[in-house]
């Protein structure tokens, strides 16, 4: 992996519709781009093909109603989940995609949320669509909190990773996210990104189940008009389990002396057998005590 990247997607249709579409949002401050993204998703899930205009940020405890293409949407503030994210998923093996294929298929439950880091490049001669979806194989409704951001498609694979990370960190620091309801047997598409040849997409996604049993996370790439790849063609990247994906580091600096701070430690085993150095997808907080 060349960058601290991020991204995702997968195909789905779903008979999922609210009588009055409602967008449930969490966060001390929900950035304008995420308000727009969450509202756009709810419209799509309700079968409404229209673009949501640029939005104002959503302040703490603030709700409002949007009128988009003749449809009223209610933005409702809700509390963020108590569950922790303890599983790190890396979708970067393969990094280069040349045809329709599955990239990640993973089941998770209430015992630990997931953080997906993804970074992929279209090396085919035509267009490719990258999809991310959540599906509920159970017999009861599943409620899932998601917080995700992406960047691209662009040609600069270093730049796209940094932009995606910056956008996601704005959500992370504010606990900004969207609470979604997945009916039994239902699927919801979270993201679809269309890449031209040589373009790259990158992104991060956190998902925590607040109610229900296991939920499936899928990432796949398809050529326009082609069916979703069979499950047996998926090649998962590595999955790491931690007590926490947040690390606190405290060090003391004494005037007149030098101090070295290191970021990332440990050697992870990538799915292709190669070693990667560093702690991709983890948050490090440094406290420097001056004496």
What are these regions (language model features)?
Residues 51-56, 124-131, 199-203, 280-286:
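Short, solvent-exposed loop/turn segments enriched in Ser/Thr/Gly
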Residues 18-42:
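Solvent-exposed, low-complexity, repeat-rich "mucin-like" stalks and linkers
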Residues 79-85, 140, 150-167:
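Short aromatic-acidic-glycine turn motif
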Residues 162-198:
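Intrinsically disordered, low-complexity Pro/Gly/Ser/Thr-rich segments with frequent PxxP/GP/PP motifs
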Residues 197-233:
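Terminal connector regions
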Residues 70, 74-108, 226-264:
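A eukaryote-biased signal for short, well-structured alpha-helical docking elements
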Residues 120-128, 133-152, 209, 289-291:
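Asparagine-centered strand-capping/turn motif at beta-strand->loop junctions
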Residues 37-62, 66:
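Serine/threonine-rich, repeat-prone extracellular segments and beta-strand-based repeat modules
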